[in-house]
């Protein structure tokens, strides 16, 4: 390796998938330093995003994670949930190769399936302001703040009153975790936004509580309850400034009975559907321009499903002629041909307990390791200097790692 030019090694490594690079770290100290350097990690991720190389479909089960290579569906890898605690583990977001995991509102982690690195978030209790209030729905969001170079997890708790109690509106708690600071903070929510979370008006399906990231903002949809005089709403959270606002969308969609939010080709998209007939897909082509909302296409209900309860676009094909859709669950992954307006199965087998997402093969840890390990390292540094003499029996170039 010493005779091979550094630039050539760097270029070769940039072409490899993250799982291979993890193994290459042990080749030599220079390889270890190169692969772990922030500059290389950023360059590797940038190449993946620009070329679409080594993209994977992440199949998310209650007890198992499974990755399937998009270009080679026969290449499958199973990954046990690192947060296993006897119950079901949710995956509430995926960004730049990092995913958010949740066993409960106080048991969360950030995990990179390619490097198997995990960062468990410090426990943050839900602070109910009054005894008569209890938890109802919990919204989550995982995003990367490109301004502050920081991964963040947003937890929004929608509260409700205990039976027989009256109060308007019910409080909403918003807390944000910063990976850089490894700490939580509370974000104040203005009254006009608290009203939007009144449980009487809105009903949340579990997966609608996971935020989607576009333009350095996390977004959640608040679908109105059928039969209630209310409008659909889209909440947005600025990952850099902590500002919470509302994203505008066409008025004709205000009273849609079935609507979901997603990301298509880097743009916010809305799926409005007649569960027994079709799904209309709308896209906000220019984030700052409300008038750029466009109805792109109508997807017919596939014959293989009785009704459409949930639909989400995952990714465009490389030639941009097709879009991969998840319909109801990962057992119904289908390619939608934009020209013929037809659906064909993606040929990826799994049962209906799995849901799907797109995963980038990256070295972005989005995590600094397990906090318990970090604490052990911190304690080690605080040990008396006399303990360092035990390194003396090791060969030159080695260190004793406790």
Swiss-Prot record:
Domain F-box: 1-49
Domain of life: Eukaryota
Disulfide bonds: none
Name of the protein in its database record: F-box protein At4g22390
Organism of provenance: Arabidopsis thaliana (Mouse-ear cress)
